[in-house]
Amino acid sequence: MLVVESRNPSRRSVYIWGLITALGVIAGYGAVLLANVRHFYTDDTESQYVPLWVMLGNRLRDGDLPVMVPEHWMAGNYAIEEAGLLNPPQLLIDLIAPSVDNLVLYATVVKLIFAIILGLGVYRICLVYGSRVQWAALAGVSIPFTGWLLFFDEASWMTAFTGTAWMVHAWASGVRYARGNGGPIPVFVYLYLAISVQYIFPAVEAGLMIGAVAIGELVYQRTWRPTLRLLFVSGLAALAGLATYLPSMLSAKVTWRGTAQINNDQFLTVPWSESLNASLPSTLPAFTSWWGYVQPMPVVYIAWFLIPALAFVDWNRARGAWRELTGIAVFALAALMWTAGPGTIGPLRWPARVLPMVALGLLLLVCVLLGRFATFKDWRARGIAAAVLIGLLWIRSFSADPHNWIAHVIAALALAALGAAVVWLAVRKSTTAAVALGIIAVFPIAYIQVERAQPTPMSWNLPSDRAAARAAFPEFAGTTLQLGDRALIPPGERTLDGAYGSLVFGNYAKDIERTYVSGYTPNGHYWFGDMLCMRWDTSVCPDAYRRAFAVEPSTGKTVVDLMNVDRVVLHRALYPDAATQPAPTGWKWVDYPGHEKYIAVLEREDGLISTRNGRISAVENATAVSTSESDTTSKVRVSSDNGGRVVFARLGWPGYRVSLDGKDIPFKVVAKSFVAVDIPAGSTDAELELTWRPPGWKIGGAAIALGLLGLAFFQWLYVRGREPEQDAPAEESIPDGDAELADALR
């Protein structure tokens, strides 16, 4: 017997299925961890984000907002890195991080929390579009285990993941606000959180989402006012988020990302036909990436039921709701088009990164259709149609990856059997039983997919025990410049007992609380990187050693002297004869027993230089004495009879200002990298103050204030409009039960 549930769920059922959604996500994470305990601690998570949390947390505990750390050089401008300095939840993550030694555990717990947030956000969206709670829960449990999210954003690209988690709540709250069932504050807050993760893709995707929702609500409600109201509030959130990106925009000219060109190439552009693989768990799509053409992971997979379930939608009834679902369809279509190119749009590169948006849009569309118009009448004919769809899935997956055709056959047969079981439960028992099986099926599929992808090609295998790593690593005081190449470390030596007991790459130095030049940086500093041929992960070319000790002609000082570097660590695989060569003048070779296999170490003969006279690195025809020093400000007492110059161990980022005895004076950049100030002739004990602030910080602060003022105005309008005499809900308003859920979650 087919049981049809009401579209107006009770508060109790909304909470129960919301809890089921959260528990389902937790169970799914457990399945993934059984396949690979480090799945959520790999690639950029281990090499960029988690070490960054540790460093930022230590500085926040010291009462400092670390917008700039000069000793980190081209990775030290954290106003333009993915630090999330204006994102309160991210700051909380940072604050906790230094207290946790087990980084795998911490990263996994943090990501689990955001996966639950994401799942509940998708659950909310389904409800505001009228889905029954069971199908909404299926969508919520499924979304964290869609291909690209599971294997890239959750495993590696943390800011993309957190931005998506906040964005889906902005979507749900945006629809509620447009339909008069919620206020502007949730829309503003969730959008701001998505924008301020400090990663451009979620910000742009949030804009795409709001545009799609605005179009959808205009089509659905046939009036401009709700849409304009939503667009204004969203614009205010974007205005507040401007402070996050202004420093990057105003610094772009000196970074690797200083182009506004639109180019197309095949790298990580995904043909639309790959979406036909969305329901076959074994699928390995075909497009160009780091690993060639056929991918080693099912990154276009969305959900096992997504395509076959189309056979069980009552399309005659669904056609009557096309206006209400326009927003979801527009979003899914726009995301699908983006994945196919262009390959680069200014700072936006690699269109495959938008695959989670395709998954989100299609999953929402199908689950809302099922949640409102699922039917199991004529189930035999519909079953045949579903079998045909599964056959098409197999054909497309075979076309992309013919060598694994047997795995695709097994997956297709398993999918057919699972679908048949769900249909039987829906016909003989209830929708609840059918959906429960659908949710349970998510877990073994996630396990099999992750286990099948082992060993993951993404892992750096950095040590995850901070205490053990600190104990194993040399006690390097001061500032260290490492010249090495990560590619030269054999896979078997990427362990704490191997190379990682002596070498750092990416942000690993932050895990062990050592001060190293640079770190993981997607932005870089073009001229500094060129000077030392240093790449995004701190790897260098073989010529870096010569360049580091080359004399800068205008100062007569070597590059390492201008940087106030205390130590140079040479990767023996890159410089096998290093220790047999004479040390540069003023330097000496120092033995570190137990580390000779991997590194040769040069230190200054007269001890640490970074602790002397602030960050002054060169003085010409003048005297200069540091009187005060912080990461963003250098105060110096200077004198010069005939005019001179002071050079600082600071990278010449946009945002510096210089004053002499309170009067602004210009500054220069030596070798396109080092900040230098000309001292006027006749200066005697003058106070020189060099200060850095994130460029555009005043505009950004004003934008935040203006955004909040605008929000207050729209909140006043909303409260004023909810007086008791307000009109009854419109005929096509969303179910009351859905509004209750959003009230609880907003």
Mark where each language-model region is.
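Active-site-proximal, structured, solvent-exposed surfaces of multi-pass membrane proteins
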Residues: 49, 613-746
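Membrane-interface helix-loop-helix junctions at transmembrane boundaries of multi-pass membrane enzymes
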Residues: 222-228, 310-334
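Start-transfer (signal-anchor) and selected internal transmembrane alpha helices
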Residues: 1-33, 229, 431, 710-746
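Contiguous transmembrane helix-bundle modules in multi-pass membrane proteins
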Residues: 181, 202, 326-339, 343-345, ...
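Soluble catalytic regions of membrane-associated enzymes that act on cell-envelope
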Residues: 437-626, 630-631, 663-665
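Membrane-embedded helix bundles of polyisoprenyl
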Residues: 117-129, 134-219, 229-248, 335-336, ...
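Periplasmic/ER-lumenal interhelical loops and adjacent helix-loop junctions
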Residues: 84, 234-321
